[in-house]
A protein has these predicted regions:
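N-terminal membrane topogenic signal
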Residues: 1-15
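"…centered on the first transmembrane helix and the immediately adjacent amphipathic helix/loop
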Residues: 16-110, 114
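Membrane-interfacial segments
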Residues: 52-55, 83, 119-128, 154, ...
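Hydrophobic alpha-helical membrane-insertion segments
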Residues: 63-72, 136-147
Length: 209
């Protein structure tokens, strides 16, 4: 199957993420929280490198995964409630809490939705754009819900030690707003990125028609 990115670009991106991973790990506020936050990056990056020839993804998806990985690693470094740029946005918008975690949950909907869309469209598993859009949003929300369950299990297992990982900042509706942000990310995929995504799929011969 034709590669969608030159090996140099893909390997450079992977190297950059590896260096950021090492740096954020060394300077992490809490090593256990950092490890819990960056585990998806540790799993996904080697997987993408291993499947580059057999199942290359669109450049759009590679780019968004790259950005999401950085968001996760920065969140793990400082903990989401203490990311400096989040405090700047909080002050600028007059918010009551650091909103950086909401950016993370937005990408938690955006990226899985695009992954699901790419798999469904390329495999021709579903007919009809509306059904694809519906299933893509369902997948993103399911992943978001699973993450909230993981946070709950962490809270049960670690008690107050899980506070940095949970990052609720005293918000009683944190779980619901997290999932809403993930839904907004998924809707961004199906409303604003779908057409461009299809153009890339056709351009690289990943779909026909």
């Amino acid at each position: 199957m034709t590669r969608t990115l030159k090996p140099l670009i893909l390997n450079t991106g992977a190297l950059a993420l590896t260096l950021i991973l090492i740096y954020t790990g060394i300077s992490a506020h809490d090593k256990l929280t950092w490890l819990m936050e960056v585990t998806p990056v540790i799993i996904v990056v080697p997987l993408l490198l291993a499947t580059d020839r057999r199942y290359p993804l669109t450049p759009l998806l590679y780019t968004l995964i790259f950005l999401h990985a950085i968001i996760l690693m920065v969140g793990g470094q400082y903990t989401y409630a203490k990311v400096p740029v989040g405090f700047e946005v909080q002050e600028w918008l007059g918010l009551s809490r650091n909103p950086y975690d909401k950016l993370g949950h937005f990408f938690q909907g955006l990226v899985p939705a695009l992954v699901a869309r790419e798999i469904l469209v390329r495999g021709m598993y579903v007919r009809g754009r509306k059904m694809v859009a519906f299933l893509v949003c369902c997948v993103a929300l399911a992943i978001s819900a699973m993450y909230e369950l993981i946070e709950w299990w962490a809270a049960l297992a670690m008690g107050q030690g899980a506070d940095d990982f949970l990052g609720t900042q005293g918000d009683q509706w944190d779980t619901q707003s997290d999932m809403f942000c993930a839904l907004l990310g998924a809707l961004t995929t199906v409303i604003f990125l779908a057409r461009f995504h299809c153009r890339q799929l056709r351009r690289f011969g990943l779909i026909t028609g």
